[in-house]
């Protein structure tokens, strides 16, 4: 499989497949394809279906198979970027649960539960995430622009939870309480931040869709407004 990223701030990834090659996606993100691509739907087994239902994900995956040389394009659902990730055997990448776009079928997608329960209960989106393992190329949706850092052993980055796109498996995630009652009540940044600790790469996004939705709420007409 070869691929090309197109579209700027409204991106698509166009994948060229050889005969018999397959791509998988969870969210119906296919935007166009050649007529010799065949789609099938799989639940991935009862255990995987249960874990996906628990995490709020779709319980089914769409698998696209090329019969002869074929082409298929996957589009992002929000303005931003598409991040290609090459997954090597023994390597893991953890993503926010809505970030996965598509992958080669050699990439295994599973639910990742953070070991520290407070990360999810107090940190918001970070408790249930997605784990990519196996071997192959995967693509992740980025809300807004992408910023990448490589953390050394013990090096930390404090991030608003919604701005965390993902990180390598060697990076640990925790929460940090914002200090000071005045900061909590008047700072407008919430009560908790996410702390990522190296070693490994982390990927951050500049405009999480949750933040955009919150910013638009005051401008949405209600029954009491003219």
Locate predicted features:
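Composition-driven recognition of glycine/serine/threonine/acidic- and proline-rich low-complexity segments
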Residues: 1-226
């Amino acid at each position: 499989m070869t691929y090309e990223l197109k579209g700027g701030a409204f991106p698509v990834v166009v994948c060229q497949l050889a005969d018999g090659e397959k791509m998988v996606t969870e969210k119906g993100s296919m935007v166009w394809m050649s007529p010799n691509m065949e789609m099938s739907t799989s639940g991935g087994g009862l255990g995987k279906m249960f874990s996906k239902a628990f995490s709020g994900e779709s319980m089914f995956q769409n698998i696209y198979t090329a019969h002869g040389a074929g082409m298929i394009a996957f589009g992002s659902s929000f303005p931003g970027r598409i991040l290609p990730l090459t997954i090597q055997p023994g390597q893991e990448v953890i993503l926010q649960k809505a970030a996965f776009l598509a992958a080669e079928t050699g990439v295994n997608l599973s639910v990742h539960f953070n070991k520290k329960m407070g990360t999810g209960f107090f940190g918001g989106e970070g408790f249930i995430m997605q784990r990519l393992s196996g071997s192959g190329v995967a693509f992740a949706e980025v809300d807004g622009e992408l910023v990448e850092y490589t953390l050394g052993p013990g090096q930390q980055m404090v991030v608003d939870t919604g701005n965390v796109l993902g990180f390598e498996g060697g990076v640990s995630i925790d929460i940090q309480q914002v200090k000071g009652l005045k900061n909590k009540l008047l700072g407008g940044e919430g009560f908790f931040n996410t702390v990522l600790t190296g070693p490994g790469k982390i990927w951050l996004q500049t405009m999480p869709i949750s933040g955009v939705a919150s910013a638009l709420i005051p401008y949405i007409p209600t029954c009491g407004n003219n």
